[in-house]
């Protein structure tokens, strides 16, 4: 197995760091780092559901993805200034939402929404996969918050963990967790979202200027799923620590006689 420009083996993830309680106000707030890629993921419960969801008795989960203007080497203009979201931003936002909805029983939320926000602070490839992986941890913390507040119909609505990783063919070799330098010249580029129960949520894959055989697809998936297993361990280790956010306030104490 060959080494890469950054010294990693083909099947080796970049250093993964998950920091919970990164900001104070959201119910779930996480900074996730895949090497030099850093994404802030928050999960915020809000009252109500979209209009088309009203009356269903079920909640909703939505996600938004964005990059800070200086997340890359060259500053980009804020999309809010442009007045429109790029197709890439919309695609990744929907991907994150779909991925997280695969692991939660929305009926347990009642008619309430969890809004997930993923903001890329620094980009070096794999921002969407880092966002999905970190957003799951933020969601788990938001569920802990809602359960402590007595706002869930089912105190354990999460059925599985969700993680994502990039994988591709670079220099004729199958490699996992591509940096920007590798991703920009990959012959095959793929993103894999999986559950810790061994099932797949989504696969996004393209031959970048070249076709590839079924046997390569199988090898790509095998390497991606092996990497996701390592990400699940990182998620579990992070979530094993005490809840980092502010605990919900309980009901007000009964008034004293005569007050």
From Swiss-Prot:
Q: Which residues bind phosphate?
A: 88, 126-128
Q: Which domain of life is it from?
A: Bacteria
Could you tell me what reaction this enzyme catalyses?
tRNA(n+1) + phosphate = tRNA(n) + a ribonucleoside 5'-diphosphate
- Xref: InterPro entries: ExoRNase_PH_dom1 (IPR001247), ExoRNase_PH_dom2 (IPR015847), ExoRNase_PH_dom2_sf (IPR036345), PNPase/RNase_PH_dom_sf (IPR027408), Ribosomal_Su5_D2-typ_SF (IPR020568), RNase_PH (IPR050080), RNase_PH_bac-type (IPR002381), RNase_PH_CS (IPR018336)
Has UniProt tagged this entry with the keyword tRNA-binding? yes
A single MF term (Gene Ontology) = 3'-5'-RNA exonuclease activity
- BP GO terms, sorted: rRNA catabolic process; rRNA processing; tRNA processing
- Among the Pfam families in the record, one is RNase_PH_C
Which keywords fit this entry according to its UniProt record?
A: Nucleotidyltransferase, RNA-binding, rRNA processing, Transferase, tRNA processing, tRNA-binding
Q: What is its EC number?
A: 2.7.7.56
Which protein family is it in? Belongs to the RNase PH family.
Task: Show the HAMAP family listed in the entry.
Answer: RNase_PH
Self-association state and partner proteins as the record states = Homohexameric ring arranged as a trimer of dimers.
Question: Do you know which PANTHER family this protein is assigned to?
Answer: EXOSOME COMPLEX COMPONENT (PTHR11953), EXOSOME COMPLEX COMPONENT RRP41 (PTHR11953:SF0)
Q: What does this protein do?
A: Phosphorolytic 3'-5' exoribonuclease that plays an important role in tRNA 3'-end maturation. Removes nucleotide residues following the 3'-CCA terminus of tRNAs; can also add nucleotides to the ends of RNA molecules by using nucleoside diphosphates as substrates, but this may not be physiologically important. Probably plays a role in initiation of 16S rRNA degradation (leading to ribosome degradation) during starvation.
State what protein this is by name: Ribonuclease PH
Q: Which organism is it from?
A: Mycobacterium leprae (strain TN)
| Gene from which the chain derives | rph
